[in-house]
Amino acid sequence: MGVKKTDIVLLDDKGIRCDGRKIGETRRIMIKAGVLKNANGSAYIEFGENKILAGVFGPRDVHPKHLANTDRGILRCRYHMQPYSVSERKNPAPSRREIEISKVIKEALEPAVMLENFPRTVVDVFIEILQADGGSRCAALDAAAVALADA
């Protein structure tokens, strides 16, 4: 059975992936916490060729005040890919994909943050994708979790 033009080749003849890893080899991971001095918590992660920076700010007052919840705090997450993070420059405006990933990350992190201890406040989590190379969603969630733990 030969390789068709429509087939995706994941391994070369020697069993090496296109990114240079062997079949059972995982991506290199590097995590640093506390990298932003003006944030309450922050993290920098390199996950393979992905480079991600996350910052946590808060709890702080909600603006405008009418959005405040009297029973619990609010968690806001923003996942943003820099225009230079991918090989073909992307539009800097938030894409539908970025908005959806922001919501997914918020839903994943919300149970871990004790928002009931911070009524009428907001905790902002900003995630910047500096370089993307597959798996940036998972790495972004990891960066946000480390930044929250650092806060």
Where in this protein do the model-derived segments appear?
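Short, Gly/Pro- and small/polar-rich lid/capping loops
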Residues: 1-37, 44-46
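Glycine-rich, flexible beta-strand/loop modules in the N-terminal catalytic cores of phosphate-handling
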Residues: 33-35, 40-119
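Beta-strand-rich binding-surface signature
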Residues: 28, 42, 51, 122, ...
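Glycine- and Gly-Pro-enriched alpha-helical subdomains that act as flexible
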Residues: 135-151
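Short, conserved phosphate-binding/catalytic loop or strand-edge motifs used
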Residues: 121-127
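A short glycine/serine-rich beta->alpha loop
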Residues: 90-94, 127-135
